[in-house]
Amino acid sequence: YSFSVNVEYFDGDATDQFFLKLAYTDANGEAQYATVAEGTAVKGEWVQLANKNYQIPADATNMVLYVETAESTNNFYLDEAIGAVGGTSILGAGESKPFHLGDVNADGVINGMDLALARQGVSGAFSGNAARLAADVDQSGSVNGTDLQLIQDYLLGKITEFPIAEKTVDTAAMEKLFAGITPAASYKAEGENNPLFTQRFGADPGVMEYNGRVYVYTTNDVIEYDSNGNVTENTYAQVNKINCISSDDMVNWTDHGAIPVAGTEGIAKWATCSWAPCAAHKTINGKEKFFLYFCNGGNGVSVLTADSPTGPWSDPLGKALITRATPNCGDITWLFDPAVMVDDDGTGYLCFGGGVPDGKDAMPGTSRVVKLGEDMISLAETPVTIEAPYLFEDSGINKIGDTYYYTYCSNWNTSGNSYGMTSGAIEYMTASNPLGPYTYGGELFPNQGKFFGLYGNNHHSICAVNGQLYLFYHNRSVEKAMGIEGNYRSPQVDQITMTDTKINTVTGTMKGIAQQKSVNPYVKNPAEMMSDQAGINVRGLGDTVVTEIDKGDWIKVSGVDFSKGASQIILTASSKSGCAVKICTGSPTGKAVGYAEIPAGGKLSEVSAAVQGLTGNQDLYFVFSGQAEMDCWIAK
């Protein structure tokens, strides 16, 4: 067959790549997408996409012809879409002439004729839009004396490429624009560092320190609805991903995305759920390896492995690590909630289990600890029972000094106990051996409802960072701020203090931890690193991008050290329809230090904002006027 269509666009870059494609279903029932024709269009000029001898695959059904761009989201127009017998030449706009800045007549070279045509265009008119775009060598949007001088300098050998003009931002117009924009509301109050992130929920924090950076892995709670669209109680049935965030200052957290663990799209496709993660790293055969343990509902503990704390992750076993067929595990009520520790000698230990058999509130006997194999994905011995009084769930295992600590959540029937413990609280036990026996030590964290008013299951991790101990736990602060109630949880952190081997009671706060170090603005910082936000989301995995930005949305980066000053901030961002960014300090309504304009077209590009007044330690805000995505930023 012979196919042809004409394409034209008016937004974005000077050129764009277009494809005429055929979507079809093959004999195996799989969707296929084949290129019929392609071409490069110059903005404002028609281009023809044509192939006069295209062979449609013999097994193709459900066929659709369509046009798309290579990367951008530019609006475009189509005309004269024609199909004919193979070999037919279809008259159309034809191919675009080669486009190069400075080559005004499109003859493939830049010479005196191009300079003459550019001068003629400045004083009169260009032969077409392609000629005008080629003469605009500094890409300022207009052709003027600056372009003529640059072409002349190029011909004289003074320059070898054309510099891009910095767009002058109309500050008065920007001030007027943002005066009419109300910043979106955050789920955190000013001065609060808890919860750690708010763009998604995140429960059951499992924490790992690696090279001075803290990685927090959480159950990705998903809001559930009834048939009428009302929020219902969290059943955890839809949880098949694990969130990963990290920080080196305990306040600004980088969102590495939600790891697809279970289900048909997951890494462990045989699993249905991914709850209560924990993580560890270990040097094996001279190489650092990372291990992410999770539970497949209440019926087994599984493990993923990677060469980096953010993945990509793989399923080394293709099945659970611990099941009810594992010795001494068949009668565990809830076979879940793993916690892992790598001892000083490199030996790994895993705790797990939970649940309260009928009549055994005081001593459920459902917790286990096991020595792992050298590979961290096998068991070296039979799991040992931990006699933890009033156990409910949520195991933890740590070595502090020379003492091993087993920590857990107490059950809901603790009244009258002899230990002085309360219900749904984090308790601790101590031992001189990671396999026990353990002796009850005390209560280190009451139920979070005591501090925040919303009671629920308690789940924690203890992690040492730079010699300081921290308690990570979850709370229901974000769902409260959203005005919903269904046990949807978010991670928080507060400091642990000790008296000898006694863990002092931790107080839960919304203020959280003070920032441990300043942010360096003179290196590229990911946009997904933030201390607070309103309205945004994050897409991707590992190397992510801030997305779903709309009018009034914003990102906050706390404690940025501008001791060297700054004259510009460069953003890497995109917008389908164009977007302005207000860069300010103190609050989303604070005084602007500069503005940036993201061009339309949907293509990630660097945009620069001239800034002034940035000195000392500042909380930096990026406030947006419309739809956008943002990848990173750097100050110069």
Please place each PLM-identified region on the residue numbering.
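Cellulosome-associated attachment modules in secreted, modular CAZymes
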Residues: 90-172
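Carbohydrate-active catalytic/glycan-binding domains of CAZyme proteins
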Residues: 170-594, 599-636
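Surface-exposed loop/edge segments in extracytoplasmic proteins
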Residues: 28-37, 589-595
